[in-house]
Amino acid sequence: MGSMKEIFNSLFLKELLKGMSVTGKYFFARKITVQYPEEKTPQSFRFRGLHALRRYPNGEERCIACKLCEAICPALAITIEAEPRDDGSRRTTRYDIDLTKCIFCGFCEEACPVDAVVETRIFEYHGEKRGDLYYTKQMLLANGDRYEDQIAKDRELDASYR
């Protein structure tokens, strides 16, 4: 037999009333759920999304084929091949990122000495096949050309944190 207090609590369903009070408190509280995709929350300028390769203002690719991004990538998602130029510097012939492997850690962006590879704010992309998420050098350069204004603005805002 339980004590009189246990009988009283079970008779008046004290636990149930406590639970209902918590539910009632949150039922009438202000809603914080965002109805995506109709509503969108603001993104940080430091958001790490889809990759892009940048160019200098004269149109030349920034990548100097140092392969630091390939070496630092923990997921081994970056593949780079390079060949020497006539002036002795190197040029990338292949720069591929496999987004099915990428964990979007941002190490490639931090390792790049010339800010050639960056991660944009783009997070809405898809692929119907596995190969659609394999980005080649041309696709990455196209992303960089398309979003260069936003990338430059984000890099300027991020400069104080670097």
UniProtKB/Swiss-Prot annotation:
UniProt source species: Dechloromonas aromatica (strain RCB)
Protein name: NADH-quinone oxidoreductase subunit I
Family matches, as HAMAP family: NDH1_NuoI
Substrates-to-products reaction catalysed: a quinone + NADH + 5 H(+)(in) = a quinol + NAD(+) + 4 H(+)(out)
Ranges for domain 4Fe-4S ferredoxin-type: 53-83, 93-122
Subunit structure: NDH-1 is composed of 14 different subunits. Subunits NuoA, H, J, K, L, M, N constitute the membrane sector of the complex.
Gene: nuoI
Family recorded in the similarity comment: Belongs to the complex I 23 kDa subunit family.
The keyword Transferase is assigned to this record: no
BP GO terms, sorted: aerobic respiration
GO cellular component: plasma membrane
